Amino acid sequence: MNLRAAIATLVALALAACQEAPPPSDEGVARPILYEVADGTGNVQAWLFGTIHALPDGTKWRSEKLNQSIDRAGMLMVEIAALENEPRTRAVFARLATTPGQPDVGLKVNASDRPRLFEMIRKTGLSPRELSATETWAVALLLAQLGGTGDAENGADRAIVRAFLGREIIEFEGVEMQLGIFDQLPEREQRDLLSAVIDEYEEVRKDPSKLRRAWLEGDESTLLQAMNTGILSDPELREALLVGRNQAWLQQLEPRIETGDRPFVAVGTAHLLGDDGLIQMLRDRGYKVSRLQ
């Protein structure tokens, strides 16, 4: 079970208005979204990098500007640091996701969505009976893996963590807290999440590599368009999965900036963009946040 890929499909490329165009770049050169944070005098204090959780073998995405920023940083802040500890991730998922006596999974969606739901379940290699004790949010995460491209072993998040080995690495959440956010969603919102995953699967099948290309190109407008019609367009899900988390992360990040730790922040691209993103939140706090690539 590739849980990080599931989570990535749900929350990594979120969406709200961000109109800043990427700097000029030679065609074909990867330029994932990278910003620097400076004080009022222009002194660079931090960096913000939008990650993706799975990539095909051989994908080139490490630019000179990115490598220079990593070298200048003093420490790393990420959603989850222990990405390689998959046994623990599976154990936490199984514990939080399992509650006996769940309603039949087909009753958790509208009748019109049931054929697509059962088709997706079949493609996971599971059966509806095997999901009889699985909570709705967990079914959504399992199904969200379908249609994705790439391998989590090649994910930008893992590569960034490896680049900071030997320096301080701080988790904003960790796996238990992150999955706990899904687990604590009201059942109504969990069902909205499941329905949204079913709808998004249809879009992903039309062009499975669309969001990956947008990430590589730093194409914020495409990422915005994708998510403005996706899971995070639901106000309650957006608040729980994006806005509230960003606010909590800002409370951890700002002291690190102010004490001169030079943090490099590497989180799902969703958490950077838009009025509710970390970029705008830092600007609202008086920092100068500028795009490097």
Q: Residue ranges of each PLM-predicted region?
A:
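Bacterial N-terminal signal peptides that target proteins for export
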Residues: 1-7
